[in-house]
């Protein structure tokens, strides 16, 4: 009887632990790291590995770096040359990306969704491929059908769910540059904290240390018996062997020979459609039935480089634009968000900290000085950040950005669908919200000095970088 009671207690304890783990997963709480984060000294990070392909290259930041490891993310930069095609690829983690330069078209494969894009005219000569007989006759009037294809351009934030294969083609006259972040600590990733790339086509003949794999990386079809592929796809053995790309050394970004013809909407119509989905007036439409956005039709990108969409705009200082689950609903599913900022010369972003997210700040243009302070009040970063570099800003760490002479442009990825910040200076800051008596006693200053601390900075986000120029409180109150 005693043993039975002990067994019941032990079983109950195990159930409590499992219930807690499941609750953390349902809330999106990342699993604990094996080692505590060492964030006493932050660095400005640059790519450490480059993998070249026929029509572009992939550049990786070391995901084992303590800063990226602690944030639970992996960062890469994709460069697709003119006429280059990034072959279909998916990941075990959700992905968010920003188009730094160029334009193109992209498509994603969502399992279970219908092919809603159809060619208006039958393709010719299809009867000569595949097996003979009846199959060839059926293909004489073949019309290509595929899932949704969208235009992407400079300034777009792109969200991709875990397990959804996607491809990108460069339609512009300059390289298409995209910086990408994988949230490998996300609840959707059921594997370890190593970024894993799954290729439906193409290969990586150079291997990849970012995945701790030095051997050549093939596409997923390469591992199957060719005879099994031929049976599954109802094709000849020779064609099944072609799908495995055994002798193909072009990499995962290939050059398209001739015109690239896929069914896609005109560019102008695409962005007019976006304006219809997000009208400036009341969200009512006679065509809106409440079911217009499902997992199959859900938008995957939002342009945040348009000044008209800025959340904070000051003509002589710059602008800041955020995209979260309210502006791009798919972000609620992958639990990521982004912020785009442009800071003009001799301006600064007021000191602030992220309340509920880690931030990965990537410089897209110019340079600026960034200072970061940790939980012990120590300055853990004070460096110039230039184009192509990134900084990891942990949750709760206060930071400030200052541009001197040159403009500074950046994109920040945040590990929360609705990331929140709290400023340390300005009209909506924590200091502004404190009573004067709390400030005077906390810093041992006079009441007048406390009033200056609270009211000398009327801005909320951006201000001039010049210091030591106090403004009269009466002028601020009157303004």
UniProtKB/Swiss-Prot annotation:
A biological process term (GO) from this entry: seed maturation
Signal peptide residue numbers: 1-23
Domain (Cupin type-1): residue spans on this chain: 42-241, 302-451
Record-listed Phosphothreonine modification sites: 116, 415, 440
Pfam families: Cupin_1
Keyword Iron set for record: no
Name under which the protein is recorded: Cruciferin PGCRURSE5
UniProt organism field: Raphanus sativus
